[in-house]
């Protein structure tokens, strides 16, 4: 097997390091975007839950106990 020139090894190392850094940067950007979208979705879900609770209150519907699914007025 032929020996690899030290200059060639440095070039290969540099290319691999650059490629790995680019991949890491892209994954970080994607991760940040995903986390941002999850945060947005969480805020929207919170708003939706609040709006549903407000609509239920306006309609005179009692909120259900989340553990037993029994209207809170019937709980003893």
Swiss-Prot record:
GO terms for biological process: axonal transport of mitochondrion; endodermal cell differentiation; muscle contraction. Keywords: Nucleus. Its main location: nucleus. GO terms for cellular component: axon cytoplasm; nucleus. Pfam families: HSBP1 (PF06825). Transmembrane segments: none annotated. It comes from the Eukaryota. The keyword Chloroplast does not apply. Gene3D superfamilies: 1.20.5.430. GO terms for molecular function: identical protein binding; transcription corepressor activity. PANTHER family: HEAT SHOCK FACTOR BINDING PROTEIN 1 (PTHR19424), HEAT SHOCK FACTOR-BINDING PROTEIN 1 (PTHR19424:SF3). This is Heat shock factor-binding protein 1. It comes from Mus musculus (Mouse).
